[in-house]
C-alpha cells in the first residue's frame, strides 16, 4: 500500500502523556485516538497496540516509545507514550521525542504521586513549555470535595516547578469510560483536546530560528577554498551571509561564498538540509568536526554548565559500577566528544547506574552551547549516560 501523503495544511505540534505509573497514560492515549477516530480525525488504536511500544535508540540509549498521530479541528499532533517510568526519564533527558507540550495524567483516586512530581520536574528541566492536566478515574470518586482537593494539590505542584499552576487547564474525566464509548466521558476527551489546542503554544518552526550547523567534515576545493559540511540544525543560510565559527577555539567570522547540496549550487539552504558551505578566507586547518557555524551573536561558546543526566544501567550497556565526584568522561555534543569533569551536588557521594541526577560540568574546551542542548556521556566510545543542559555558568 502506498504511503499516505503528509497533510501540511494544519500546524504540527509534538505532545506526550506524562504521569505516575498506572494513572492511565496509555488508556488516555487510546481513548484520544478512539474518540477522534469516531469523528474521522485519527486511526483508532487499541490499548495493547500502544502498550507494546517498539524499541528506539536515541544517543545510544534504548527507549520504548509508542507514537500515535491525530488531528483536531486546528492542529496535527504527534503523540508519544512510554510504557515504563524509566523510558519516560530517558526519553525526556535524551530528547528522543521532542515535546512542545505535555498532558499530565493524575488519577483522582490517588492524587499526585512520586513520579507525578518527577515528571513535572523533568518537563521543567528539559524545557517543555506548557502542561495540560487530565484528572483520570473521576468516575471512581463519589465525593466532589476529593476532586477539588486533588486539583488543588496538582496546581500547587505545577507552580512549585515554575509552571503556571493557577491557569493550567485541568479536565476531569475517565479514560476507560471514554475508551468504552461513554458519550459523557468522550466529551471530556474532546474538552482535553480543545485545551491542548488553546493552551499549548505552537512551536517556532526551525526555519524561523537563527542559523546553526554542526560541522561534520571539512575539505579543500582547489582554487575555490575550504568547504564545511553538515546537516543544518535550524534556520536558513544564504549566499554572502556572514557566519561565525564557534567552539574548540577562538570565534571567527566568515562569509559564505557557496552553498552546495547533492553537488548542485543553491542560493540558500534550510533546517534539515545536508550541505557543503564554502567559506571565504578559511583554511582547512582552522576548522574541525565539533565546531558549529552559526548566525553571528546567536550562540556562544562555554565550558562550564549544569545538567540533568540519566546514567545507564549495566543491562543498557552502561557502567557496572557507580562513579564518584571528579569523574572525567567524554561529553558528546552534536558531532564531537569533549572531556569534562563532573562535580556532584552537595551531599551526593556517588551516582549509581540507573540514577537521574543534576551535575556541574567543566569541559576542557569550549562548545557552542545553550540551555536544553542535549548530549551523551561516553567512556571509551560507549554511551554511559545522557543529559540536557539546564544552566550555563560560564
From Swiss-Prot:
Q: Could you tell me which PROSITE patterns the record lists for this protein?
A: G_TR_1 (PS00301), G_TR_2 (PS51722)
Q: Which residues bind Mg(2+)?
A: 26
**G4 as annotated region, ranges:** 136-139
| Annotated spans, G3 | 81-84
Judging by the UniProt lineage, the source's domain of life is Bacteria
What name does the UniProt record give this protein? Elongation factor Tu
- Residues bound to GTP are 19-26, 81-85, 136-139
Q: Which organism is it from?
A: Fibrobacter succinogenes (strain ATCC 19169 / S85)
Say yes or no: keyword Lyase present. Answer: no
Q: Where in the cell is it found?
A: Cytoplasm
